[in-house]
Swiss-Prot record:
Catalytic residues (UniProt): E50 (proton acceptor), D61 (proton acceptor)
GO molecular function: tryptophan synthase activity
Catalytic class of the enzyme: lyase
Domain of life: Bacteria
SUPFAM superfamilies named in the record: Ribulose-phoshate binding barrel
Annotated source species: Sinorhizobium medicae (strain WSM419) (Ensifer medicae)
Protein name (record): Tryptophan synthase alpha chain
Organism placement in taxonomy: Bacteria, Pseudomonadati, Pseudomonadota, Alphaproteobacteria, Hyphomicrobiales
SUBUNIT field: Tetramer of two alpha and two beta chains.
Extent of the signal sequence: none
UniProt cross-references to Pfam families, sorted A to Z: Trp_syntA
Length: 279
């Protein structure tokens, strides 16, 4: 785990609450608006920012995030420009961890060693690469860890106790528990099952466990946050961005304020989780 991410989890744990992890697609709807969104996420209460890297074949993404990726690609977003987003944000914020989330193909084309060097220089703290299983750790995970960049793994309800140790073997930063099977932005999670799932994962690791997929409201964030170390919100933010755009997919005056308002509500939810868990 990077020092910045470790410090963030420690600081938030000292407050007695879960972290709020927010995802959006880098370059959606354009570079400058994305940078403003990153800053708004932090100002609204996001503890960790997941920065999506657009890809032309996003097999694990739901319709909303697929469309966001298409808008970003149309606007000219690339992996290099996504790293530049991180670099620009990091110039003004040295504390908020940044996690890149995407697919291996753009990294492979960019060049693994070059990518890791540039990501570290840009202030990236971790990555989630959804199409690289543990059996391919030598491709990117092990080199990333050697550079000091966390490699965050996904676990799902179908990750059984035989598979879980392999998934967690080289995981760093935190474990991202997908609270349902399927694609991102699916139906709401069954919060009654989440506590048991988090406990099962924690029996195998000391890493924080963050739960996502299906979190849309402050109430969802509060309910999940009462049993997890963190709450991940993505599709709701992407949908908020999309709803504010013109028919041509351009940003409006409502784009950034709309995201900030949504995330302020979600942040209030995770802070209320501390109170709910203590009752």
């Amino acid at each position: 785990m990077t020092a910045r991410m470790e410090q963030r989890f420690a600081d938030v744990a000292a407050e007695g609450r879960p972290v709020l992890v927010t995802y959006f697609m880098g370059g959606d709807p354009d570079f400058d608006t994305s940078l403003a969104i990153m800053k708004a996420l932090q100002q609204a209460g996001a503890d960790i920012i997941e920065l999506g890297v657009p890809f032309s074949d996003p097999m694990a993404d739901g319709p909303a995030i697929q469309l966001a990726g298409q808008r970003a690609l149309k606007a000219g977003q690339t992996l290099a420009k996504t790293l530049e987003l991180a670099r620009r944000f990091r110039a003004d914020d040295q504390r908020t961890p940044i996690v890149l989330m995407g697919y291996y193909n753009p990294i492979y084309i960019y060049g693994v060693e070059r990518f890791l060097t540039d990501a570290l220089e840009a202030g990236v703290d971790g990555m989630i690469v959804v199409d690289l299983p543990p059996e391919m750790d030598d491709e990117l995970c092990i080199p990333a860890l050697a550079k000091g960049i966390s490699f965050i793994r996904l676990a799902t309800p179908t990750t059984d106790d035989r598979r879980l140790p392999k998934v967690l073997e080289n995981t760093s930063g935190f474990v991202y528990y997908v609270s349902m099977t399927g694609i991102t932005g699916s139906a709401l999670p069954d919060t009654s099952l989440i506590a048991g799932a988090v406990a099962r994962i924690k029996a195998h690791t000391s890493l924080p466990v963050c739960v996502g997929f299906g979190v849309k409201t402050a109430d969802h964030a509060r309910a999940i946050g009462a049993t997890a170390d963190g709450v991940v919100v993505g599709t709701a933010i992407v949908n908020q961005i999309a709803s504010s755009l013109t028919e041509e997919g351009r940003a409006t005056e409502a784009t950034v304020p709309g995201v900030e308002a949504l995330v302020r509500g979600l942040a209030a939810g995770v802070r209320a989780a501390r109170l709910a868990a203590a009752e």
